[in-house]
Amino acid sequence: MKKEGSSGSFRLQPNTGSLSRAVSWINFSSLSRQTKRLFRSDGELSVCGQQVEVDDENWIYRAQPRKAVSNLDEESRWTVHYTAPWHQQENVFLPTTRPPCVEDLHRQAKLNLKSVLRECDKLRHDGYRSSQYYSQGPTFAANASPFCDDYQDEDEETDQKCSLSSSEEERFISIRRPKTPASSDFSDLNTQTNWTKSLPLPTPEEKMRQQAQTVQADVVPINITASGTGQDDADGHSVYTPDHYSTLGRFNSCRSAGQRSETRDSSCQTEDVKVVPPSMRRIRAQKGQGIAAQMGHFSGSSGNMSVLSDSAGIVFPSRLDSDAGFHSLPRSGARANIQSLEPRLGALGPAGDMNGTFLYQRGHPQADENLGHLGGASGTGTLLRPKSQELRHFESENIMSPACVVSPHATYSTSIIPNATLSSSSEVIAIPTAQSAGQRESKSSGSSHARIKSRDHLISRHAVKGDPQSPGRHWNEGHATILSQDLDPHSPGEPALLSLCDSAVPLNAPANRENGSQAMPYNCRNNLAFPAHPQDVDGKSESSYSGGGGHSSSEPWEYKSSGNGRASPLKPHLATPGYSTPTSNMSSCSLDQTSNKEDAGSLYSEDHDGYCASVHTDSGHGSGNLCNSSDGFGNPRHSVINVFVGRAQKNQGDRSNYQDKSLSRNISLKKAKKPPLPPSRTDSLRRIPKKSSQCNGQVLNESLIATLQHSLQLSLPGKSGSSPSQSPCSDLEEPWLPRSRSQSTVSAGSSMTSATTPNVYSLCGATPSQSDTSSVKSEYTDPWGYYIDYTGMQEDPGNPAGGCSTSSGVPTGNGPVRHVQEGSRATMPQVPGGSVKPKIMSPEKSHRVISPSSGYSSQSNTPTALTPVPVFLKSVSPANGKGKPKPKVPERKSSLISSVSISSSSTSLSSSTSTEGSGTMKKLDPAVGSPPAPPPPPVPSPPFPCPADRSPFLPPPPPVTDCSQGSPLPHSPVFPPPPPEALIPFCSPPDWCLSPPRPALSPILPDSPVSLPLPPPLLPSSEPPPAPPLDPKFMKDTRPPFTNSGQPESSRGSLRPPSTKEETSRPPMPLITTEALQMVQLRPVRKNSGAEAAQLSERTAQEQRTPVAPQYHLKPSAFLKSRNSTNEMESESQPASVTSSLPTPAKSSSQGDHGSAAERGGPVSRSPGAPSAGEAEARPSPSTTPLPDSSPSRKPPPISKKPKLFLVVPPPQKDFAVEPAENVSEALRAVPSPTTGEEGSVHSREAKESSAAQAGSHATHPGTSVLEGGAAGSMSPSRVEANVPMVQPDVSPAPKQEEPAENSADTGGDGESCLSQQDGAAGVPETNAAGSSSEACDFLKEDGNDEVMTPSRPRTTEDLFAAIHRSKRKVLGRRDSDDDHSRNHSPSPPVTPTGAAPSLASPKQVGSIQRSIRKSSTSSDNFKALLLKKGSRSDTSARMSAAEMLKNTDPRFQRSRSEPSPDAPESPSSCSPSKNRRAQEEWAKNEGLMPRSLSFSGPRYGRSRTPPSAASSRYSMRNRIQSSPMTVISEGEGEAVEPVDSIARGALGAAEGCSLDGLAREEMDEGGLLCGEGPAASLQPQAPGPVDGTASAEGREPSPQCGGSLSEES
């Protein structure tokens, strides 16, 4: 154990040692000799862990190489023995090189450490096992030990206890306060004396014990690393950091920036000494990746250290400052942070700030502690730690945090959550660039910076320190300051950091981001982070976001702080996820970078900052302050932690953007951390259950979950408001502190899963609960701790709902995960519905499956999320304990929210979305997070949400409350309000998203208004009820911006309000039961649908109440898409707008449809509500009702009304719905309403189930959708056309084509939405005009419902795989009867596969189908198309292939679908089998591939869930493209290029003169990319005109990817 403990401890402690070591290692190259010596010393010290604590401290101070060298030699020996990670790295300093005494020390330390660790384990009742964590990575010990030990060693062994005695701290201060003098002297002294001190293992043991206790009570011990000299300590740590950073190449900056750094550096091996520990640690974290590797990695590489590298490398370059440097060393983060930052601050000129920083730091320990420990013990930090300790703590936290962050992987970081410092470091890393830019360059620079610094610094210091009371509440409340503090933990140096470039980031991230996340903080954050971000923070930040990964790491550490305070001293394992997160973050970064550079930066910077700061705030401080963290972290941790509660915070602060981003980032970030995470995750699961509430609800979350769930369900509305969100955050976060950890874990695990992908997040969310699910899960979980995913995507608005959602989710375990899910899944919120179902159906299974998927997911940010989404859905559900515990239909809502967790996919998508548009994502997140929360009054709020949404989502928070209420109370009457809220979130987020897209939406106005506003209200309305209010409001608010909005607004307003009323009334009927679905008889009413539609919508909403989440998911998807769309194509702007709308209103049609209709079944058609709420509602009706009889009607209406084109889609949708119905509910089908009624029922049900499934699917597809979103925008029209033609070849062709152009904008969004929703099936219909799109959405939604049905399917992922192989023929045989289904299924089923169940089933089906298709005729073509991505494939070939593929694929999907629910494959068709079938067949042929594409995407997701498609899924997720293979091949490309490709494609499409073509192609590309082949074929046949061509090209293009993906999956 000693060795392990040492190793673990080393890793943990080595947060300091590790950091030192990492730095040493890094310097090893740079400063080989001294570094080696330092390294050895550090290693030995670290190895000693506790023993080495003092030594480490010496190390930190090791201004004198001589002592350090000796110690390092000894330490090295120990380290080598202890730290496997370091061993190899330290092997460079072979034990041979060590003196015998050192060797002996090593041995002794090992033995002692083992005993100590064991004892610690005993002492540690936080569920973290020292050995476990040590094994995993000393990170956890680092939490107590690493933070303390590392930093204690650094800070002072004296501070043996994390919150060691004040005298020691004073001594430390005395010794260390003199930065240079004490540093050098102390270094020497400490080195020798501390060596002796540290050598006595009993001391370390005691330390460990104390630390464990302290950590538990206060993860602040980690801060001890910063050991009482706020300044010196910070500097001392900073020394490491600067050194580390220096090593990273930032030493100069650090040196200059770091007063102490300079001094110490100069004293010690200017760079060597300092760098060695951090570097060492860092390297350890990276598992042998050198700084070079790290740096190489840092930019976008995945890789745990990559993030750290990112931190180092990116921050380096980004920070261009010591900040960057030490950002480089996230572990040293805070230390470096403070050190660098302080000096930097001095350099920057904020000498006062520097003093303040030190002051701040000094006070911050308290604040940090408070924050960090607020999580665990809200006031623990402050209360727990004596003032001096606090200061020290702060410093420790600061210093430690970075060290922790730098710690072996983010694990240590994560472990050292309390050290927002880590965050700082990471954050600094992430944001410093931004901040540097922002602070120095940006507006944020002076005022924001100053303000943040001041405010954050003050507030952080005061608020946290003085105000820590609010700790949970204060920062929770959105006290940027505290969150800032949270970040402040790193913020100790963070104020400096803030002052420094990074200061803005850390403070910005923590203060700004977290604060900004919250509200005022948002301000700061926005000012700083955003400005900084916007500046280049994005790019830098993104890069830096690797640092963010560090942050992520930090987050877990924070979590740990909190968790430690609570039960997760080892929570740091989350740090591992954190590490992963760094990597994930990097991934996210890439993702976000592509689309959301700024956002990415913001997310990264902020997210990362958030991750680090927030995450780690959320983690430790965020744990208690998850919301806060979330808030502060808003995004990052929202992604991870906020993914849980942070999500809520994110919802609040980062609400949409950051959280989203964070999620995205987180998701990627977490990836790296998966190994360390497992222990953390388990601990997290138990302890952090906050966000893991879903997963971990069982353990610590059980009560929290129960409480949160209750509060979420019952009170959430009130609770969820921003305050509730915060409340839940506060109460959840604080209570959830552990949960935060759990969230961190769940969130991290989930998030990690999501980190892998937001989905991973979600997965991990569930995974955390399935701690057992291995490190990966843990890893994923951590990111979730951050949300997932990414995160937080949905979190902000949803974070209130993510506090809501997360609250909802939290109870569900979704908290973190949920937030992530809601945030992360903001895109996937709808997925949650489906996810929920799957979740509910087989949450655990899914969860499990997800884990693997997560793993893959982790790699592919968004794609993973996509797959994991469904998986996560399940994962979340099970993991969330809430999903499971709350599997009720109401729970479904919760579940949906859990699903939001599940929305991880969404989060992933969110990641994508993040990339797409921070705004969109944020919006999404807000929507997602908000979905539950935002829709407060969204009806009135919607305008706000729209504007507000654009804003921070102020309305969403209120809605969040409502939504929270609704979310958790989906079953409750309250839920209805939430739906509006949800709507608003969507609306809001969408609006928010729309805000960007709004202009875009303008073009789409006609349909978009209807489409856009409609679905959100509808979708979110719980869905319909709120939707209408939201929609009208949205429309009015948002729509007004759109000219269109006037009329649709009007009609919608009229309709929507009724709908809202009815639905609100109906909310009580949230149960989406077959009965409810049946009730939902979608009436063919089209125009008069206003009332009826409202009713229907209401019914649908009611039935889809549960699907609300899915809606959300879907919406987030749409949102993501919208974002993507928006980002990708302004041209797609219409679609983007629609997409934006989709997420909100745009996706209203699609998403609304998907979310609404799919979730609502019928209401989905509301999405098309472009025409009017009435129509939208009617459309759902028609969509559902007309499916059978409306085919012709649909045709005419679509023709007559483009918006009603969706009506055209309905037939396919009907089939789709029917088929899903047949799968989902033959009973429903059986329940004969009119055909429409039946269909409506089925649709409703299907929508519901599909909603859930589709939520999964959408969750799965959201990324796809989002990717498609951008692409979908273009593709959508094509798809719509394809769909419409399929559905109504007659009408479809002409109106279709015409509409596609028109719909290109509207449908683009709609279709995109549909696409997003049901890539293929719905996608085409979607494209069919908004109507078609809506209808398709409906289909999709229904398909989603089918997918909802799939919940069980996810359980049978393996079965599905087997069945797919077995039932291939069977499916084919069934295909005939399922032909309609096929047709619809082709499009729809793909969506269904997209859904959780289909995802699972689809994976194999799609895999098989796609394989078959690919093999068939488009194998090469698909690949070519994929490669070309131009849609160059010949239409004929594509068509033929598509048709054949469709047939091949459709049956599989059919089988997949029918497999899950083969009840009446043809039953739906029955309604209008001939027509539908024929249309669908044609549609399938034309659009089948596309749907299949979606399906493929879904399957991929599903598959992703399944281990088989892990890699593919992972990449796919990451790419946000369903096609994993291609995605995998071009992850970066997928992320960046894909959108670009989409944009380019969109441009091409436009150039081609077929915006539809462009859209179709883009969508296809995205969707096709998702599905690859399916869309190509589908699209081609679909639109004879350009749409066809485009579809062909596009479809083909995606097809190859799909094929590749399938192939890979297969």
UniProtKB/Swiss-Prot annotation:
Modified residues (Phosphoserine): 24, 198, 328, 568, 639, 1089, 1167, 1233, 1386, 1388
Disulphide-bonded residues: none
GO BP terms, alphabetized: cell differentiation
Compositionally biased intervals (Basic and acidic residues): 1240-1249, 1373-1383, 1447-1460
Protein's recorded name: NHS-like protein 1
The keyword Phosphoprotein appears for this protein: yes
Biased composition (Low complexity): 715-730, 895-928, 1001-1011, 1180-1193, 1461-1474, 1504-1516
Pro residues bias locations: 929-946, 970-981, 1012-1031
This protein's record includes keyword Phosphoprotein: yes
Keywords in alphabetical order: Phosphoprotein
Compositionally biased tracts (Polar residues): 433-448, 578-594, 649-667, 740-760, 767-778, 851-865, 1041-1053, 1122-1153, 1405-1422
Residue numbers bearing the Phosphothreonine modification: 1392
Top-rank taxon: Eukaryota
Family: Belongs to the NHS family.
InterPro entries: NHS-like
Classification lineage: Eukaryota, Metazoa, Chordata, Craniata, Vertebrata
Positions of the UniProt region annotated as Disordered: 145-169, 433-477, 531-602, 649-693, 715-778, 791-981, 997-1535, 1566-1610
Tissue: Widely expressed. Expressed in adult and fetal brain, fetal eyes, adult lens, kidney, liver and intestine.
